[in-house]
Regions:
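Conserved acetyl-CoA-binding loop-helix of GNAT-fold acetyltransferases
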Residues: 99, 105-118
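Conserved GNAT acetyl-CoA-binding A-motif
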Residues: 113, 120-132, 146
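A short helix-loop-beta-strand connector motif used in the catalytic cores of GNAT acetyltransferases and
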Residues: 48-63, 93, 151
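A conserved beta-turn-beta hairpin within the catalytic core of GNAT-like acetyltransferases
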Residues: 71, 82-94, 104
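Conserved beta-strand in the GNAT
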Residues: 59, 69-80, 98
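Short amphipathic alpha-helix that is part of the acyltransferase structural core
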Residues: 1-43
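Conserved catalytic-core motifs of GNAT/GCN5-like acyltransferases
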Residues: 80-83, 129-137, 141, 146-157
């Protein structure tokens, strides 16, 4: 099985698979991370392009020829936040790293995170940050991240 990697926008634009199949596979993957309500295909496409204005959603996928089915096995997003400080450079925010339960431990998260880090460097970010649960801090430590400060949040949902 060969896993291929591509941005979600490029994957949609490639027209290799139906938009409905891509939406189903992607939202199915995200549901392994958090609540992911079903949305229309049009809403999915619009949200994909909205996110692309601020960053990149990067996915790993493979196509099962026997089943005639697409599997999106991993995903991560980097959002670029412009700053006045640090000579006007941006911060890269890595978000929504998720690997399909059946494919964890195969290096997919590392491939995705490495790509997002390199993209942040190419975009001249002065740093890249991510939030994670304490139980997976060691994983991101292996990718070169250091624990700095603490994250706080106020949820509206």
């Amino acid at each position: 099985m060969e896993i291929k990697y591509i941005s979600l926008v490029d994957f949609i634009s490639s027209k290799l698979f139906s938009l409905d199949k891509i939406k189903k596979a992607y939202l199915g993957l995200l549901s392994m991370l958090t609540d992911t309500p079903d949305i229309t295909t049009l809403a999915f496409i619009n949200k994909t392009y909205e996110i692309a204005k601020m960053g990149v959603v990067y996915i790993g996928y493979y196509y099962d020829v026997e089943m005639q089915e697409i599997f999106i096995v991993g995903s991560g997003t980097v959002i670029f936040e412009p700053k006045f400080i640090h000579c006007g450079k941006s911060v890269g925010h890595i978000e929504d790293i998720v690997v399909h339960e059946r494919f964890r431990g195969a290096g997919i998260a590392k491939t995705i995170v490495d790509y997002l880090i390199n993209l942040a460097k190419e975009k001249d970010c002065y740093k890249v940050i991510l939030d994670c649960k304490p139980e997976i801090e060691n994983l991101y430590g292996k990718f070169g991240f250091e624990k700095r400060g603490s994250q706080m949040a106020k949820y509206f949902l």
